[in-house]
Amino acid sequence: MAATYRLVVSTVNHYSSVVIDRRFEQAIHYCTGTCHTFTHGIDCIVVHHSVCADLLHIPVSQFKDADLNSMFLPHENGLSSAEGDYPQQAFTGIPRVKRGSTFQNTYNLKDIAGEAISFASGKIKEFSFEKLKNSNHAAYRKGRKVKSDSFNRRSVDLDLLCGHYNNDGNAPSFGLLRSSSVEEKPLSHRNSLDTNLTSMFLQNFSEEDLVTQILEKHKIDNFSSGTDIKMCLDILLKCSEDLKKCTDIIKQCIKKKSGSSISEGSGNDTISSSETVYMNVMTRLASYLKKLPFEFMQSGNNEALDLTELISNMPSLQLTPFSPVFGTEQPPKYEDVVQLSASDSGRFQTIELQNDKPNSRKMDTVQSIPNNSTNSLYNLEVNDPRTLKAVQVQSQSLTMNPLENVSSDDLMETLYIEEESDGKKALDKGQKTENGPSHELLKVNEHRAEFPEHATHLKKCPTPMQNEIGKIFEKSFVNLPKEDCKSKVSKFEEGDQRDFTNSSSQEEIDKLLMDLESFSQKMETSLREPLAKGKNSNFLNSHSQLTGQTLVDLEPKSKVSSPIEKVSPSCLTRIIETNGHKIEEEDRALLLRILESIEDFAQELVECKSSRGSLSQEKEMMQILQETLTTSSQANLSVCRSPVGDKAKDTTSAVLIQQTPEVIKIQNKPEKKPGTPLPPPATSPSSPRPLSPVPHVNNVVNAPLSINIPRFYFPEGLPDTCSNHEQTLSRIETAFMDIEEQKADIYEMGKIAKVCGCPLYWKAPMFRAAGGEKTGFVTAQSFIAMWRKLLNNHHDDASKFICLLAKPNCSSLEQEDFIPLLQDVVDTHPGLTFLKDAPEFHSRYITTVIQRIFYTVNRSWSGKITSTEIRKSNFLQTLALLEEEEDINQITDYFSYEHFYVIYCKFWELDTDHDLYISQADLSRYNDQASSSRIIERIFSGAVTRGKTIQKEGRMSYADFVWFLISEEDKRNPTSIEYWFRCMDVDGDGVLSMYELEYFYEEQCERMEAMGIEPLPFHDLLCQMLDLVKPAVDGKITLRDLKRCRMAHIFYDTFFNLEKYLDHEQRDPFAVQKDVENDGPEPSDWDRFAAEEYETLVAEESAQAQFQEGFEDYETDEPASPSEFGNKSNKILSASLPEKCGKLQSVDEE
């Protein structure tokens, strides 16, 4: 490095930028583009452009006489918080939030980037903002940045164009961190910076400056403009796809929430229900998040923005009213939702850093908040619901200010679960917005249990204070609607149960379960009462919920009143009062699962009330369950009321609830260490799971089934109740009227098939099923009678097709059943008209198509195709496609004549004596003896026969050769994988053992040594194959393993095809991986092979025809015209195969 330096202070983020200490004249400066810092005496080692403009003008006074390493803490998420001895943050006391929380300009990200990319690539002549101003996008959108390793420094172009920069050392930012001094300022009039900051930001640059910067960038770094454009387009495509998917999902959710809120709420409420407020907050969230503008480099305007002045001016902004509840059905913006989660995680990360030292310091910022902070708290909730947790806790600390023992820092820390990993507190980032409050309450109680001295002190607080607090909770609780009150009581009970002391006996656990059952019954009773019309605000609900939770836990004997019920202290609160023990984490998790089941049960009751849940259809079952719960609760009520005076024991009890709701097992487990982490709560299923009333095995209640299980298996297809069979039959009768004498031959049956709604080439099966094969025609009466019976008994295409084509009283298709259908295709399809002059080819083409059908469709290898196999295949769709496609070679599945031509030519080359059978020696000559002799022996041993067919010893028919050729050339096909697995499974146990693999690899080694190639030792090869296949059971490779690994073709070629094995060894491994990952509609290996071989065969035939034509011209000395030459060559090409064929046998003769 050329420049000398004395000190470098850096925070690493996505762009590897740094913060420079300007006390020194020279410093090593790392940046990501063309840098403008050369004039300041700072050397830059990377080409950079305008990223560090603001860094050169950071006030130096902030860094004097301070430990810069503690001021700038590098962090993975771009978070750095100044703690300990430095109460002020690095940038004028403002904390830095998660990267990406930057202020965007008013133009759309994709529009600006698209216009700029087009301008830079020369597609447009000028770049203007007028076009962007007239776009249909929203005026204020947050761009979404995609993080990619390959997009490290090239993405500066997008940031340059869109004003989207990192906060991590490049530009100052601020946010709503709970530990910062920002909250010391009045927050009562917070609002968005939509208009003011936007206009302020747009004054800092103009169109000419932006175009100039674009030109400078591409002049300096023009060699990579193509790469930049490609990466930009990739990112824009990804953003648009994600935006569309996320928008559709949000739109559906919002529409559902909006409908339920409007139907259940009151139209005269000035403040809607919590769901409505939630939706409004989601739509308006972007407007209320504070963002800082980033200034483009301007001459004379390089000073940083005074953040303190900006914050002081914020209270003057007025709060804009909420928009209607999605009257236009517009969901929240995708960027808003993403930004919300980003800022949330950043806020959590800072608290995580602060909580590393829970006992070393106390937060005093809460005490400086004014007492009249109710409005500010409400505004804060409206602006950002994620910050509600922190502010609510602070508000409660104000209410309990005389209680000096509980500090605000302790309350902040109660929001997290203690983990053992790394000795630090980890965050549960999987919390959902809807379930957030309930989980938060659980965590508050957990932490309060860890500090029992605070709770003890609070119990000793003055009685007037307790009464006042109880009134606050009672007042807010009374105003709740019934539905919301149910959820609040659920969370109160849930938090109360979490304080259950695990040192209690089995009897105490029974009492707890009884309380839960009683609570479920009370919730169900409350649902029968009319819903209250009075709705409270979202802040009141959440605030009263959290306040009541905290205060009721701290004062167990206080009573809570509500219009629904009086919640009296239960047995578990007495247990807490008596024992005062710390709750064991494992039993807490078990109880949490029980409580979540109760919540699911309550949710199902709500849906039952609104006729939306599954219980609304099973009211008889619900009645039985409720009677069981009521009886059990009354029977054990006296047990719950009995006082608890036992001391804590050394062992704790764990409750295990089985699927049978009558049995509960109690297991005693040794007490774990206090540091044992709490396991994550189990995810509750959507269906309700009623808990057991009492752990008595003899009280078994067998609930009878209230409804019959509906039929779900239809072997002949699902009946269509909407179809009108008589109307169809009348149309068929009318169609027969147009036919002479109302007698249709096989050619007229095409019209009848279309009237029946069937593909054209169903006409031959219909003709045969109606008895036309015997008489040569079909009458209207016979066909209508047959079709009426078919419609009544068969309801889908697969079952109808098998009924038409199969033998009488047969439910499956055999090979000979396809002959009439395929013969009709050969006779009538326009792509096979040339076969009329070569009838000897008909049987061979039909045989090939039949074998290809069974190869693909008959996955059971039974030799009989069932309706299930027809449904799973694409045969009926391909058959219907014959009607539309005139070129039959375009239908590569089953019917391609080119594929038949390739198969038969390959067979003809191996069949030296032309007896239509090939021997083992003949097959070994295929592809220059590429296949090993041992695998060929296995083929001729009968390992791959289908159904009841018997392998003729030492002979392979043409039908068997079709299976061999397709399997050899396409080892990725599922049938091919099973074909070769059967061959390699010598002992037939369904597993390829190491001995079988070694048996086949030995011959490969011998052949490689004969060629002068040193083979890989079997042990090393075996390790490679096991890594390739990754079998489920070590040392045993099954058919399922090979079908799952998607590399079966390499596995098989390694053991019995030397030529392809060597090709795989010499091929680029990255190309192999690319083939594996490519799931697009690529042609199969068989399609590629058939196309290449057909081109080769046609070229050979053409060369032979030209040679023969030249020889005839030499003898006659008469030149032939081009037309005569073309006609002769076509005749030779079409006649070449019949000359090879000789006398062909029919399918029946085989």
Swiss-Prot record:
GO biological process: eye photoreceptor cell differentiation; negative regulation of canonical Wnt signaling pathway; positive regulation of canonical Wnt signaling pathway; positive regulation of protein catabolic process; protein dephosphorylation; regulation of canonical Wnt signaling pathway; regulation of cell migration involved in somitogenic axis elongation; somatic muscle development
Pfam family, one: EF-hand_7
Keywords: Calcium, Metal-binding, Repeat
Residue ranges annotated for the EF-hand domain, each copy included: 758-793, 972-1007
CDD domains the UniProt entry points to: PPP2R3A
Pro residues bias (residue ranges): 676-693
Gene3D superfamilies, per database record: 1.10.238.220, 1.10.238.230, EF-hand (1.10.238.10)
Keyword Membrane: no
Segments for region (Disordered): 661-693, 1105-1132
PROSITE patterns, per database record: EF_HAND_1, EF_HAND_2
InterPro entries in UniProt: EF-hand-dom_pair, EF-hand_13, EF_Hand_1_Ca_BS, EF_hand_dom, P2R3A_B_D_EF-hand
Positions of Ca(2+) binding: D985, D987, D989, E996
One Gene Ontology CC term in the entry: protein phosphatase type 2A complex
Tissue: Expressed in heart, brain, placenta, lung, muscle and kidney.
GO MF, one annotated term: calcium ion binding
Record text on subunit structure and interactions: PP2A consists of a common heterodimeric core enzyme, composed of a 36 kDa catalytic subunit (subunit C) and a 65 kDa constant regulatory subunit (PR65 or subunit A), that associates with a variety of regulatory subunits. Proteins that associate with the core dimer include three families of regulatory subunits B (the R2/B/PR55/B55, R3/B''/PR72/PR130/PR59 and R5/B'/B56 families), the 48 kDa variable regulatory subunit, viral proteins, and cell signaling molecules.
Role, per record: The B regulatory subunit might modulate substrate selectivity and catalytic activity, and might also direct the localization of the catalytic enzyme to a particular subcellular compartment.
Stated name of the protein: Serine/threonine-protein phosphatase 2A regulatory subunit B'' subunit alpha
Organism of provenance: Homo sapiens (Human)
The gene coding this protein: PPP2R3A
